[in-house]
Amino acid sequence: MAKGGFPGMGGGNMNNLIKQAQKFQKQMEDMQKEIENKEFTATVGGGAVSATVSGKKEITEIKIKPEVVDPDDVEMLQDLILSACNEALKKAEEETSGEMKKLTGGLNIPGL
């Protein structure tokens, strides 16, 4: 076996592979921090309800226009809130997936 490596591979190749893996890990950490600091907002019902989520996928704000608060139709308001939250979470997920694809060159790496 070659010194510092695997059969058929020079020791320098292994060092390069380790450096590339460390660089990739740093890029992923930087991207994750960047996304965690972003906010994603979705508005539904013609502007009646909006929800904002962080890149950590935590709901940070919900805005409801007073005119949509109808005590006789609470179910509609609940549906609007759910829709706004789900849409904002979807935006956050799409952004995360898009950035990950850029970083991995489109490779689908399980667990990332």
From Swiss-Prot:
Protein name, entry field: Nucleoid-associated protein CA_C0126
UniProt biased composition (Basic and acidic residues): 93-102
Known role: Binds to DNA and alters its conformation. May be involved in regulation of gene expression, nucleoid organization and DNA protection.
Record-stated family: Belongs to the YbaB/EbfC family.
Disulfide-linked positions: none
Gene3D superfamilies per the UniProt record, alphabetical: Nucleoid-associated protein YbaB-like domain (3.30.1310.10)
Record's subunit section: Homodimer.
KW DNA-binding (keyword) present: yes
Species this protein is from: Clostridium acetobutylicum (strain ATCC 824 / DSM 792 / JCM 1419 / IAM 19013 / LMG 5710 / NBRC 13948 / NRRL B-527 / VKM B-1787 / 2291 / W)
